[in-house]
Design a protein with these regions (language model features):
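A detector of single, family-specific signature residues
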Residues: 1-294
Length: 294
């Protein structure tokens, strides 16, 4: 039994870093014979707009392409903005026959498969969700960087036998940093007194009576001094970027807040966690067949 042609006019695009090879398949509804038109484009904006014009010339509104690295994203954005439906599929679903691969053949192969509706289209959320996702992923990267810097800072304290981490729960807190600024500027730690440190620490600090013992007699080598100063400066900068990301995430999620705010009622899910979840799966659950696919 012959396969049913689902799309009489469709396009397959083979995506590369600097090159797009597109094939439009035009099928005669009477004879079911398909004619092909091919064209190559570079990936600069004027050429992407020429791709749109070329597709419109043949009244082609359906396009299929591989999810090749990040190279598909500019193509997707331009086609989406011009009302063209795009199916992004994993390369394994449109893999061509070995030893018979060229860009033109790959493009035609994608077109043929798409004509019969064979490729499985990947879930691509709406534009506003995709933009939010880029920010949340960047935020998570920054969180990881800040965590790594905190670990490096603590390692420097350990190597220098500075027991700051045992006194303060947060070595980047105000009291801890006040003490560290003083310690790093001091010529010698052997002559430190409790009076020198008491003014630097919050009066509610529980372990400030042990602070002098945690510091006195420690030896901070020049390399550790340099690292402690640089890490502290970098951590402050990262905190500023994290705050900026949070503000941007809150701003972008406002129009969608009524659709996802109930997620925060679940135990263990904060507002930030809810935003990150929505940025990955969107707010429309009908696109998922079941919970397992989700």
């Amino acid at each position: 039994m012959p396969m049913k042609i689902v799309r009489l006019i469709c396009c397959g695009i083979d995506v590369h870093k600097n090159l797009l090879v597109a094939t439009i398949g035009i099928t005669n509804p009477s004879t079911l014979e398909t004619e092909y038109v091919q064209e190559s484009f570079n990936t600069l904006n004027p050429e992407l707009l020429r791709l749109v014009s070329w597709l419109n010339l043949y009244n082609c509104k359906d396009v299929c392409m591989e999810s090749t690295g990040k190279y598909w994203i500019p193509v997707w954005n331009v086609l989406e903005d011009h009302g063209i439906s795009v199916c992004l599929t994993h390369p394994k679903y449109v893999k061509a026959i070995k030893n018979s691969k060229t860009d033109k053949k790959d493009s035609m192969w994608i077109c043929d498969l798409f004509k019969y509706d064979m490729p499985k289209c990947s879930f691509i959320p709406p534009k506003e969700i995709r933009e939010l996702r880029e920010i949340t992923r960047y935020y998570r990267k920054l969180v990881g960087m800040a965590s790594s810097e905190a670990n490096r800072y603590q390692n420097c304290l350990t190597v220098s036998n500075l027991g700051i981490g045992s006194i303060f729960s947060d070595v980047f807190g105000k009291s801890s940093q006040n003490v560290m600024y003083y310690v790093l500027a001091a010529e010698s730690l052997d002559e430190l007194t409790e009076d020198d440190l008491s003014e630097l620490v919050h009066k509610k600090c529980k372990n400030k009576d042990k602070l002098l013992d945690a510091i006195k007699g420690s030896t901070i080598q020049s390399d550790a001094q340099f690292k402690l100063k640089e890490i502290s400066s970098h951590k402050k900068e990262l905190d500023q970027h994290l705050e900026a990301c949070l503000l941007e995430m809150y701003r972008r999620i406002q129009p969608l807040s009524h659709q996802f705010i109930h997620i925060t009622e679940m135990s263990g899910i904060s507002l930030i966690s809810a935003i990150i979840i929505i940025s990955e799966i969107g707010v429309d659950m009908t696109v998922w067949n079941d919970g397992r696919q989700l």
